[in-house]
Amino acid sequence: MAALAAAAKKVWSARRLLVLLFTPLALLPVVFALPPKEGRCLFVILLMAVYWCTEALPLSVTALLPIVLFPFMGILPSNKVCPQYFLDTNFLFLSGLIMASAIEEWNLHRRIALKILMLVGVQPARLILGMMVTTSFLSMWLSNTASTAMMLPIANAILKSLFGQKEVRKDPSQESEENTAAVRRNGLHTVPTEMQFLASTEAKDHPGETEVPLDLPADSRKEDEYRRNIWKGFLISIPYSASIGGTATLTGTAPNLILLGQLKSFFPQCDVVNFGSWFIFAFPLMLLFLLAGWLWISFLYGGLSFRGWRKNKSEIRTNAEDRARAVIREEYQNLGPIKFAEQAVFILFCMFAILLFTRDPKFIPGWASLFNPGFLSDAVTGVAIVTILFFFPSQRPSLKWWFDFKAPNTETEPLLTWKKAQETVPWNIILLLGGGFAMAKGCEESGLSVWIGGQLHPLENVPPALAVLLITVVIAFFTEFASNTATIIIFLPVLAELAIRLRVHPLYLMIPGTVGCSFAFMLPVSTPPNSIAFASGHLLVKDMVRTGLLMNLMGVLLLSLAMNTWAQTIFQLGTFPDWADMYSVNVTALPPTLANDTFRTL
């Protein structure tokens, strides 16, 4: 028995290598079960899907496999694969990442966060609302992981002020391995700094203590449960609102940009999705979901009942709220007066958002109509604005300097240096996006998309509204266990083909699939933000499952509502567009041999 256990441990420790070596062998039958080109393409896609789900290779390294495998297997020449990694969509995302880097460089995000918390008040349910609003707003422009990692230390400081000392933590023996595994699972290279900060702060303030309820009566179970719930409510609201906020803008999360890139690959004539049209659709959905999520989390953890805020607040709680208010005010004052660099970055950030929104908002002519049609994309706007960051001075310019020959002749630092951008921009995401676009191009060129469409024939009788609901549920479930980026890369080609089969607007199915990838609330391993919050040690898996189950359900229902109401007007979803009709004509007009092989397989 001991030998068996030792062997199992050996296998587990080498699991990534085993997956790496044996997956290609296990997938070999796929190559021979389909027509040659489609079979080889499906082999590559399934191989990448397994590697992404198991992380046998780093996600970004797996995304590079099409560069090697597509040319070797005769699916796509190298000169068609490599450009997919640097489409204009990638540059739009890169510009968003660089803008986020400048915001973080000058601590503008922290100033915004503390200001919002000062405005909403310090009652627990209101503070949870403030946390959620702040995190979701930041997540619209920063990465979900960065927003969560930035907000957690703020939440930690507020909670310690509310309760005087340390929150009663769960038994450290419980699920300690899950905490570690959750962090490792998502490869959070930015997390240790924040987690070390949280741990070191608590350790310094209270060495050797595990529970010091100085401010609350030791014999009061209700008070103990109250503060434990408040702690959980704070921590669980931050990753959830980060995931929700990322859906509101095209640059907020990677799946949104993958949708844009794959639309251009499958339907080159499609121009209805851009920053402005997406914001008009997704921002109201985000607000509704944020409100529903806040009510649910506040009901569970924040003292909110069906009759409003619970009354009979003790003097202890009143004093705790006064301390929290003082901590927030002190943290804000520690930032000092607003610097010139902060003002400059804020103005450029506003220009970035406004110009992207007004380029071609669809309901009115945008400023892009002043130029040659089709020449300008959102990438042009994004790159133009972030370029300014690298030469605009971080200190207020002065005319006197030119005439004062005694003044020091030192070069003023720009708002953002390239060295800083290199250090803070997650370049791996750019490669991951490119891998998704290369995969979509391979599906299109090999005819695999047509084969997939044939397999979806039994679904032609499914009502479109029901299809939207089913798609969102399936993808939301799948993304609980796999990266949302990998999930949408795998599913979007299938959804595009299903839309053609159903003769419905492709966006009617592709948008729910894309947004549904962000509805991963039930498990610590679902997203990096979930893992960060879980690794703090105050949450149990059952807390996330209990809270996240209804969050998932609300997200699915609200998304279905959006797709069948205002999205119909924004994207003209009630009609089958000409650009999709052209695609269906092109894919059915196949060479006779390919058509025969495909339908023989069916």
From Swiss-Prot:
Q: Where does the entry say this protein is expressed, by tissue? A: Expression is highest in kidney. Detected in placenta, brain, liver and pancreas.
Q: How does it sit in the membrane?
A: Multi-pass membrane protein
- Cellular component terms (Gene Ontology): basolateral plasma membrane; extracellular exosome; plasma membrane
Q: Which UniProt keywords apply?
A: Cell membrane, Disease variant, Glycoprotein, Ion transport, Lipid transport, Membrane, Sodium, Sodium transport, Symport, Transmembrane, Transmembrane helix, Transport
Primary residence: membrane
Which sequence ranges are listed under topological domain Cytoplasmic?
1-16, 77-82, 159-229, 300-336, 394-422, 444-461, 527-546
Please give the catalytic activity noted in the UniProt record.
succinate(out) + 3 Na(+)(out) = succinate(in) + 3 Na(+)(in); 2-oxoglutarate(out) + 3 Na(+)(out) = 2-oxoglutarate(in) + 3 Na(+)(in); N-acetyl-L-aspartate(out) + 3 Na(+)(out) = N-acetyl-L-aspartate(in) + 3 Na(+)(in); glutarate(out) + 3 Na(+)(out) = glutarate(in) + 3 Na(+)(in)
Q: Give me the glycosylation sites of this protein.
A: N586, N596
Any keyword Mitochondrion? Answer: no
Where is this chain's protein located in or outside the cell? Answer: Cell membrane
How pH affects activity? Optimum pH is 7.5.
Disease cited in the entry = Leukoencephalopathy, acute reversible, with increased urinary alpha-ketoglutarate: An autosomal recessive disorder characterized by acute, reversible neurological deterioration during febrile illness. Patients exhibit reversible leukoencephalopathy and increased urinary excretion of alpha-ketoglutarate.
**Family from the record:** Belongs to the SLC13A/DASS transporter (TC 2.A.47) family. NADC subfamily.
Protein name as annotated: Na(+)/dicarboxylate cotransporter 3
Write the gene name. SLC13A3
